[in-house]
Amino acid sequence: MSDILENERVLRIGRSEFVADGIRSFELVDPAGESLPPFTAGAHIRLRTPAGAVRKYSLCNDPSERHRYVIAVKRDELGRGGSLSLVNDAVDGDLLPVGPPENAFRMSRAARNLLLIAGGIGITPILSLIRSL
């Protein structure tokens, strides 16, 4: 993964909280209160952690919300440091470079019936899909 975020902008951690054992959610907002670029359900953002690592995190809020992005990060003791840096070191008010939303997990609007299955932290893109229905 590249260390350079294309079209990056700096967002502020507006609020964070532990939502489950080892999982912390982060609300990212524009420091000036401006609207954020739109995203579609299932999208993710690239984010530079406090330690400098660039990682992808699924957006889990409703795509109609333009005032914030919400991600959830699971602390991974055996990972390469991205999740540890966010979960352990990031504090509300911190500024983080973030790339624009991307989506490789689009839901078909033509589908008549949906069965959404997820486990563990894999629920994050599914939450956005559910909220968009």
Could you describe each region identified by the protein language model?
Residues 4, 84-133:
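FNR/FR-type flavoprotein reductase catalytic core
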Residues 2-95, 112:
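Ferredoxin-reductase
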